[in-house]
Amino acid sequence: LLAFLMVLLALVTILGNVLVILAFIMDREISDRSNYYFLNLAISDFAVGAFCMPLYIPYALTGTWHLGRGLCKLWLVMDYLLCTASVFSIVLISYDRFLSVTKAVSYRAQQGITSNPVINMVAIWVLAFLLYCPAILFWEHVAGCSMVAVDQCHTEFFYNWYFLLCASTLEFFVPLLSVTYFNVHIFHSIQRHQRQGSVQDCDPQKNSRLSWRFCLLPRPGASSPPSEAEDSVSSLTRSWRPEATANCPSPTQTSPTALKRDISVSFRSSTGSKLQQDKRRAKSLAIIVCVFAICWAPYTLLMIIRGACRGKCIHNSLYEITFWLLWINSALNPFLYPVCH
């Protein structure tokens, strides 16, 4: 039964993230800047299900590593790299949402620049590699010997409390504080915009100044003296602040007051729609962050405690449960993406 559940989790992780990747490739409408970061998260989660889980299942069931030291090193590098990249991707998604709400104008101006998200994603993978992988590869060479048994597969710093505390701070605690900060500011910004919108709706005299475009067309067979035309333009400028243009189409019979009211209603409707969209995305992002915290906090705390007492105070089965909880997060993420759109 345990083996079946492990295999099922791996399959769900693979299929769920494959669907996300295919949706991004086939549907160009969702290929915007923010969704690049979801794609990055889906790629790392897919690799967890396709590579890390299948190699670990026999080891978890038998307690013995049969695949050799070289493949053990590769598995450790990939596992730590992919899980850390997944965490950093969640931070980047939160930061992107933070910018889209708090700095909407500059964010939209850079929406079509694909180089920015690509650079950010590359930076994520580089930082994730530098955090654990050099220690995995070179720890035994620096120490002069290996502390891991031949039939086991875990890192050399498995019981080094100081290293685990420092690495966990960068991998979990700093990202958790960062995404919490971003989400709190997102909700505060949305609430502030809602209050401002309510005030504007109640006081129509304080609506934003609008710029009106008009043209003066001479009547057939008649001409206005220059002074009369100038007086007309001056009068309109004082009352409506228009922008004079040439080569305009024929004027319509629409009342300026009615036109102003229509544009004002349209503007408020558009702003309200954007606000509701931001609010919905903020709530869904908060769900992703909460799931991340629930899945990662037990493992991180137990790993530090286990390192401090050298594995004597934490039962191995409890540690295994928290370890699989990390991978459950990779399986859940694809099902949380749709609520963000």
For the regions a protein language model found, what residue spans apply to each?
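Extracellular TM2-ECL1-early TM3 structural module of rhodopsin-like
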Residues: L1-V7, A23, E29-P117, F157-N160
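Hydrophobic residues within alpha-helical transmembrane segments
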Residues: F4, L8-L11, N40-I43, A47, ...
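Residue-level signal for the membrane-embedded core of alpha-helical transmembrane segments
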Residues: V12, L82-S89, L177-Y181, L285
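Loop architecture of class A 7-transmembrane GPCRs
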Residues: A60, T64-L81, K103, A109-V184, ...
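Intrinsically disordered, low-complexity cytoplasmic regulatory segments of eukaryotic proteins
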Residues: H185-S273
